[in-house]
Regions:
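C-terminal structural segments of small proteins and small subunits
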Residues: 58-84
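A short, internal acetyl-CoA/4′-phosphopantetheine-binding micro-motif in the GNAT/acyltransferase core
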Residues: 36-43
Length: 84
């Protein structure tokens, strides 16, 4: 996975986006987990779970807080309160 500020993603060797999560600032020191994508051919392999865990680790490492607006993130965090 490639980590950029406010984004984690993976591409295939041709540069096609395979998976992505974005978490831009919505306020000072608060990011919005607003988008999660996994290529249809790769769904069901828990890639989105990995992305959100990586994003949460990055967010915590920066000392930021977060709000989820992405439907997947909202559901995932509700199912994993111990990781939120």
């Amino acid at each position: 996975y490639i980590h950029e500020p406010h984004r984690i993603f993976a591409c295939d060797p041709d540069g096609q986006l395979l998976a992505e999560i974005t978490f831009p600032f919505s306020a000072s020191e608060v990011v919005n987990i607003n988008h999660t994508y996994v290529h249809p051919a790769l769904r069901g392999q828990q890639i989105a779970d990995t992305l959100i865990r990586l994003a949460l680790a990055d967010i915590r490492a920066q000392g930021w807080r977060y709000t989820p607006t992405c439907a997947f993130a909202v559901r995932w965090l509700a199912r994993h309160p111990d990781e939120s």
